[in-house]
């Protein structure tokens, strides 16, 4: 899957889950299960409930995503 195939949306972290997973509510009201991307993990960026994040969704499974950016 190339970079141009992903769907980028903004959302808010509702709750942290085990194994670096998070439940994120998107701006359109949908709730997705998202994991942290490798670059965020490498740079030790903490993500807490209430944070605004950018999520990449695959067009094949719109219920799961990857957190690629945490807004300040």
Swiss-Prot record:
This is Translation initiation factor IF-1. Belongs to the IF-1 family. PANTHER family: TRANSLATION INITIATION FACTOR IF-1, CHLOROPLASTIC (PTHR33370:SF1). The keyword Protein biosynthesis applies. Component of the 30S ribosomal translation pre-initiation complex which assembles on the 30S ribosome in the order IF-2 and IF-3, IF-1 and N-formylmethionyl-tRNA(fMet); mRNA recruitment can occur at any time during PIC assembly. It holds the Pfam family eIF-1a. The keyword NAD does not apply. Keywords: Cytoplasm, Initiation factor, Protein biosynthesis, RNA-binding, rRNA-binding.
